[in-house]
A protein has these predicted regions:
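Flexible, low-complexity segments enriched for small/polar residues
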Residues: 46-85, 93-299
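Non-catalytic, conformational "gating/processing" segments within enzyme and secreted inhibitor domains
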Residues: 1-68
Length: 299
């Protein structure tokens, strides 16, 4: 339904309104139904208005930490673009998203993913979808909603009209997504999606880890598998020691050639559970660990 409004002159204060010192005590003269528009003009004529909005955009998309350099070289330019384009958001975002700063390695991994972003990252990076009958698919995605809610973000159910505090509450901002309760819930979701135990009406919903593996550049090479997974799952590279630890999970602490033999045996007879199951188990174990690493929970 459409929402309408009407101006009632008899109830309107026709006197001149004097604004606070924040607006240099400017006045709004009697203009009837147009006074609100005049007030909006006063607000947007303040240089701080554009800066304030651009800081919010920067915090949402890049980093909550606005240094003096960022304020002078990034925020100020965004604000100029904002004003020059009659306060249209799109040109400002285009400028930000195409800037070298947006892709700088120093700001990668600066934002903790929200619960919905974390859940979608697990599913989307592995090309996981529910392709069952309508009822089962609905129940599965309803369960996904429940998982996000348990992690602290029920879709379309923010705690207040201001939204989730992680998006605006200084000084913690998105660090509010993580506490001793929510981090365990994130780990529980990782366990669930990398196992064979999420069953709805006889349909097992899980990340198809072998299909994910087959889509990598060199599935038979254990070191390359780990490199590819790090590239897909993490915003920046991780230490070599961490990669070795993950690779030992993939190879079950055996030499790399053992993984090559195991994968090639599967490849020669992909429907044989004798060869398929061990590959699936190793990949499930690897993804389970990587989904719990701190690097996965930032973007």
């Amino acid at each position: 339904a459409q929402v309408s409004s009407q101006f009632m002159p008899a109830l309107h204060d026709t006197s001149t309104k004097t604004l606070s010192y924040h607006f240099a005590n400017q006045t709004i003269s009697a203009a009837g139904a147009l006074e609100y528009a005049n007030y909006i003009d006063v607000v947007f004529n303040q240089s701080d208005t554009a800066l304030y909005i651009c800081r919010k955009l920067y915090r949402y998309f890049v980093n909550h930490d606005i240094t003096p350099w960022v304020e002078q070289n990034i925020i100020a330019d965004m604000a100029q673009t904002f004003v020059a384009n009659n306060f249209e958001i799109s040109p400002v975002l285009t400028e930000l998203f195409t800037s070298a700063h947006f892709y700088d390695i120093s700001v990668r991994g600066a934002i903790i993913r929200s619960p919905l972003e974390t859940l979608c990252a697990m599913l989307n990076t592995s090309n996981t979808t529910a392709n069952f009958d309508l009822q089962s698919t609905y129940q599965i995605y309803l369960s996904m909603y429940g998982l996000a809610d348990q992690m602290g973000q029920g879709y379309a159910a923010p705690p207040s009209v201001a939204g989730w505090t992680a998006y605006y509450q200084a000084p913690a901002f998105y660090r509010l997504w993580i506490n001793s309760t929510y981090i365990k819930k994130r780990f529980d979701v990782a366990n669930l999606l990398t196992s064979n135990f999420y069953n709805v009406n006889g349909n097992v919903f899980k990340i198809k880890v072998v299909d994910f593996l087959n889509g990598l550049s060199a599935p038979a090479s254990a070191p390359q598998v780990i490199d590819d997974l790090c590239l897909v799952l993490f915003p920046k590279d991780i230490p070599a020691a961490d990669k070795l630890a993950i690779k030992s999970i993939l190879t079950n602490s055996l030499p790399d050639f053992e993984w090559t033999l195991q994968y090639n045996e599967y490849l020669a007879d992909p429907t044989n559970p004798v060869f398929y199951n061990p590959v699936e188990l190793r990949m499930q174990a690897v993804l389970n660990v990587m989904f719990k690493m701190p690097q996965f929970h930032v973007c």
